[in-house]
Amino acid sequence: MRAVVQRVSHASVTVDGKVVGAIDEPGLLALVGVTHTDGPAEAAKLARKLWTLRILEDEKSCSDVGAPLLVVSQFTLYGDARKGRRPTWHAAAPGPVAEPLVDQVVEELRALGARVETGVFGARMSVALTNEGPFTVLLEV
């Protein structure tokens, strides 16, 4: 699994003109991608990493300060544009494999005590955010 994680002051995701998930205080936005070899162990590991990653103000984590997370699925994290002019998506897991794993990341975070908002899997989404720092990291588990 891959996640692009951004420290944000606020973020929201909109589908068909309606806000479906938002955080209105400092926290993390995680864009999450799934590949064919990922399973429940990777989803649990990513959730723990997101919850304890010390990239908030004063080197704190979401678990330290109770900061919220906005988790948005993004299969394009496994796009490959090394050849030609058009990316391929062969490394991205298909929806029936990826969706339950993204859901598991969210469920694991909530079980750890996190406040989590989400996008809508497979939907065309608009993501708005204010990146603090800016601070963006790539996680791979």
From Swiss-Prot:
Enzyme class, UniProt record, top EC level: hydrolase
EC number: 3.1.1.96
General function of this protein: An aminoacyl-tRNA editing enzyme that deacylates mischarged D-aminoacyl-tRNAs. Also deacylates mischarged glycyl-tRNA(Ala), protecting cells against glycine mischarging by AlaRS. Acts via tRNA-based rather than protein-based catalysis; rejects L-amino acids rather than detecting D-amino acids in the active site. By recycling D-aminoacyl-tRNA to D-amino acids and free tRNA molecules, this enzyme counteracts the toxicity associated with the formation of D-aminoacyl-tRNA entities in vivo and helps enforce protein L-homochirality.
Cell location: Cytoplasm
Annotated source species: Thermobifida fusca (strain YX)
Family per similarity comment: Belongs to the DTD family.
InterPro entries reported for this sequence: Daa-tRNA_deacyls_DTD (IPR003732), DTD-like_sf (IPR023509)
Catalytic activities: glycyl-tRNA(Ala) + H2O = tRNA(Ala) + glycine + H(+); a D-aminoacyl-tRNA + H2O = a tRNA + a D-alpha-amino acid + H(+)
Positions occupied by motif Gly-cisPro motif, important for rejection of L-amino acids: 133-134
GO molecular function, one term: Ser(Gly)-tRNA(Ala) hydrolase activity
Entry comment, domain topic: A Gly-cisPro motif from one monomer fits into the active site of the other monomer to allow specific chiral rejection of L-amino acids.
Subunit: Homodimer.
Pfam families noted in UniProt: Tyr_Deacylase (PF02580)
Gene: dtd
Keywords in alphabetical order: Cytoplasm, Hydrolase, RNA-binding, tRNA-binding
Listed name of the protein: D-aminoacyl-tRNA deacylase
GO cellular component annotations of the record: cytoplasm
CDD domains: Dtyr_deacylase
GO biological process: D-amino acid catabolic process
